[in-house]
């Protein structure tokens, strides 16, 4: 239990570190920011691996609650609650591994950019937001993390703001994320109305006992949840923002397409598996997921732009993830998501190096890379 408490203390220290470096950015060099973050993230990831036996092998669960009673409206109270279990453990570990690799990659990739320190801070704010999302154990914390990753992704995609295509792409991603946010907000309101609860653990337990009395509300809540994840995880009809987000620097694309933004929707489905089991959302997930997987695979095969090829590949893989959730192979979904995150991040890192050497994103101009 002491080690679990120390984990949350490290997370708090990460927030303090991020806030301090953001405020005093001009007094710290970029390499200073890099060494601070890589050292800290390495310790954080190592410590998380150290409590593997407590979380995975013995299914240990720890909760850290911080209550702020300034706002209390009916059953909805503003409180901050974190929970480390097997699902949030694997997601947090994935974010830390890819985030650590991204920080190393950024050191050389953007060494000639004027605002590389800002980019490093944005990357780490993005990671922190994702960690808050996956550790969140109540409706407020979940929504806070969800909004934070959407806002962070906007600034990451818009990093090269002098490019016209970049600004257009960032606002397009922001627009689709806001649609997802609206459906999530409706979902959370309905869940709170049905259960009069705020804690996610208790809500999932209550779902089974209240289904008979609120079956119609359950189906509407499931529809909102599905539409929310459809736009966030770039499923068919909600995927239009993802290929355009390739205007962002390669490290940002690696994070968006592997461990964070697109996987947030899948995480939400996995966190609310009782609702998925009780409603017809399974059929919708299988149907849309299958169509998305086929569409993404076919379109990616016809792309000559390397980054867009990887973007449509991500769309296809997210479709497969939706199918595994719809068929209730939840453990397969988690394993698939974890491995895909590692694979996709490494693929983007390699693609960034190829683009830098070839001087072009066109795959037709990369035939002589073996000679370099």
Give the role of each language-model region:
Residues 1-9, 16-121, 198-215, 240, ...:
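Transmembrane helix-loop-helix hairpins at membrane boundaries of multipass inner-membrane proteins
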Residues 101-142, 151-372:
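Hydrophobic transmembrane alpha-helices and their helix-loop junctions in integral membrane proteins
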Residues 147:
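Short phosphate-coordinating micro-motif centered on Lys-Gly-acidic
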